[in-house]
């Protein structure tokens, strides 16, 4: 901001405006007020005045000193012969004096001062140059000695090689001559023998002799040809060796020539850099002026490139020298501390990028400089695109395997995981989702894959079955809210009394029945209506063809009714609405219809597609109409399934029977299940040893849409698992074991992925109470529903921890686990055996038995409420007014008080109020009436009180007396 007046200039200088006005007036600038304008001339006059007042003779600088520092390196051998790099620092200092028109005496004095400074500087520079020249001379002498030694060793080695080569050639020539002479003698001898033989046997064997003579002549020609080939091969070998020796000699000469060039160039460069500047130049006015205006270009600035240029020119000579035999046969210590190391050992300024021009790209591969490499090739590297791989990610994969699939190091994967907040090792197992995120983070394409999956054979087997499709009975699931009469409706249809036998009058198991009607067979699935059995209802909707939605006419649409509608719509299943309990006086079917329309279920009479049938499970009214509508919907759906084919189905319910072992209720969806078939259900497999219908009677086969109970599985299957018949038990075992391993790996991987988050949550939550439980139920569905219901009770302060949950009776193993984990055992429709009961009594383990899910949930909720920290509340018991204050030695301040309201107890806490503002909160130290200690003082009485650790009491203060009470909390 340009300052236009005195006030702005004072603000810019951060000084009072009055002081600035005084300084301006002292400088001869007449300014009367802060609003007066200031010009640049006024500011210049003020500056001159201030300089003179501070002792400066003139406003201009008379002298300027420039300091420059230059660092170079030289090689110096120590006593051990090892070359060391020595830093040589040259400091230069120049003083420039401004000359003007002053008296001659002043000029001479200034010239003498400048000359004295220049003489001292010149002497110091000459001394430094002399020392540097000595060091360089010593270095050059060492280089010459080393070069002479290298040349001498090279000449000796070359002479030895030439002598050995000549000796070897002479030996080879003698051997070749001997071989040729021997072969010629052998040929002559063979010819003589042949001639003698011919003369002896000519009269009798003329034909045989001619053939033998031809063979011998061919052998002689072959021998002569071999001798010629051997001689030619020996000559070629000798010529190649001679060429190799010539190449080595040329390489050695080139290296020696490069060394000689190097010896000559640095000397000149360093000596030139060390030349002191001429002392007469700074005295010239024109040059002094130029130096003052352009301080970045002193005279020595041109000397620096002269130092660097020869060194840079020597570097290409290094890289262009051919790497021949001279480099390979050179002794390891021969080049130690030589000129090749200058560029790589020289320290440079730290910059971004490569500023060395390729000199520092050498690498050292062994001790004492062996394996040294210079980048003799071009420094250009062609740009390459990153390779994007398609990585098939299985459901579980270790960090090492994932890195191998992407062709990178495992440490790169670990880095990415650490950035994501997870600490892993190379053997850590990752789930598929996490692994795919990592693959995409590293720039590759992730593909979910199931490699080496034996279940693929099941899909291939399914496509190969082309059995005839025949009509099958419909599977109808009865759904609705609890106590709306679903089971009673089924009892009337089946002529049974199942509802009377249910504990508490509510259904807690999913049941499967088939009913023969005059128009065909219908299979019913009865689902529980309690909110805890959501998973059961979802399984029922998954396996069904038609949903019968039971709604009580006196109760209307309830939460589980809405949930059943959502399950049916999600499965795309048609809905038949049965409005039950129409025999009650308070029944209102029209209200039920309106509520169902609001939920998206529109009756046929309103233009929808859902038939509404009013029924009464008690009187049987409307039952036939309901069955008629169900069968009508089934005809519209045209339900068909193959009969003469291996069976497929779904597990409706599963349990562990003490005498029968694992028992599963399955619904056959297609094919025919026979006794003795090999079945696979999730991770369980086995041969069907026994098969019972819903009435408990043995049966040999079950067709489509028929529910049966099977025995013979290896373990209790999960409810909702798909059941399939396989021809081979070995294949069933293989698939079951594969599923077990996959389930275990996926579970461990997900636990590991959530471990860090749970740790951080626990750290943030602090102390959390845990209620460990062990749950044993009669069937899988009930166990699943009970676990989910109890886990929903967890809060931020008390958490339900399910240590173990399974199907079957309570055993000794369960009691031992409860002892180790300090858990409570809950038995739902199960009991503990005698050994388990004795062990539980001995260890003090609490075992609770329930047959209604409400009771189990309510009691666990009450136990969790007891574990909650009690809530603390303050109750004000009285008010006290201070009338007089006494100072008692060794005791402190005692207040004489009047109890104006309530009662004051000795054990109470107190707040000190002054003008209705709390100034202290603490405890009563003493409570006296007259001179006696009392426990309490009632309203209207005087007393003496002292507060612990508080003595600042004055008359008129008020004491608010209160007590802290603990109140039990509930969930």
UniProtKB/Swiss-Prot annotation:
**Where does the tr-type G domain start and stop, copy by copy?**
471-640
Q: Where is this region: G3?
A: 526-529
Region (G2): which ranges? 505-509
Q: Where is this region: Disordered?
A: 49-85, 99-386
Please give the start and end residues of each transmembrane region.
none
Q: Which regions are flagged for Basic and acidic residues bias?
A: 49-63, 121-181, 209-260
Region span, G5: 616-618
One GO location term (cellular component): cytosol
Low complexity composition bias: residue spans: 105-114, 182-200, 303-325
Could you tell me where this protein is found in the cell?
Cytoplasm
List, in alphabetical order, the Gene Ontology terms for molecular function in this entry.
GTP binding; GTPase activity; guanosine tetraphosphate binding; translation initiation factor activity
- Please list the residue ranges that the record marks as compositionally biased, kind Gly residues: 355-368
Its domain of life reads Bacteria
What's the chief localization of this chain? cytoplasm
Q: Which residues bind GTP?
A: 480-487, 526-530, 580-583
PANTHER family listed in its UniProt record: TR-TYPE G DOMAIN-CONTAINING PROTEIN, TRANSLATION INITIATION FACTOR IF-2-RELATED
Which protein family is it in?
Belongs to the TRAFAC class translation factor GTPase superfamily. Classic translation factor GTPase family. IF-2 subfamily.
User: What is the protein name given in its UniProt record?
Assistant: Translation initiation factor IF-2
Source lineage: Bacteria, Pseudomonadati, Pseudomonadota, Betaproteobacteria, Burkholderiales
